[in-house]
Regions:
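Tryptophan-anchored aromatic micro-motifs
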Residues: 2-22, 91-99
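Short, solvent-exposed coil/turn segments at beta-strand boundaries
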Residues: 5-6, 30-36, 55-59, 85-90, ...
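Short beta-strand segments that buttress and anchor functional surface loops
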Residues: 12-16, 38-43, 63-68, 95-99
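Edge beta-strand at a domain terminus
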Residues: 24-27, 98-114
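N-terminal glycine/threonine-rich, aromatic-flanked beta-hairpin/loop signature
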Residues: 27-54
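Ligand-binding pocket scaffold of soluble enzyme catalytic domains
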Residues: 38, 64, 93, 107-109, ...
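A short, polar/proline- and glycine-enriched secondary-structure boundary/capping micro-motif
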Residues: 48-52, 72-78, 102-108
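Mid-chain, well-packed structural core segment of small domains
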Residues: 55-91
Length: 114
């Protein structure tokens, strides 16, 4: 049984590395079936994005993502998200990601459940 269930949860970016494209205007809508998690996201410099990943028994997500930015570019990457349960019971994800397109740089971000 999974310790964390992401189904029907909404997240927003609260911090991101300078080389990232998500911002506080970016909203993620998560769904989960078994240990498969997926989400649509949009807002800020992202017209539309999609992620697909697997959730471990500890709630960590290993995912791939692709998105279209406001410049009309398709950007892709990989991400590991580690959950933290906040005092209010909501989930915070600590993310380590890397572009698989563009400059292939790495970054870190934090997204909070709304």
């Amino acid at each position: 049984m999974l310790m964390v269930n992401y189904h029907n949860r909404i997240f927003r970016t609260v911090s991101n590395s300078e080389n990232g494209e998500t911002s506080s205007e970016t909203e993620f809508h998560y769904k989960q079936i078994g240990n498969i998690v997926f989400a649509e996201y949009f807002g800020g410099s992202i017209k539309y994005g999609h992620l697909l990943g697997l959730v471990s028994e500890y709630g960590t997500i290993e995912m791939k993502y692709h998105q279209v930015n406001i410049q009309g570019e398709i950007m892709t990457g990989t991400c590991e998200s580690i959950p933290e349960i906040l005092d209010n019971g909501k989930i915070r994800l600590h993310e380590s990601w890397q572009w698989t397109s563009g400059d292939l740089s790495k970054g870190k971000s934090i997204v909070d459940e709304q």
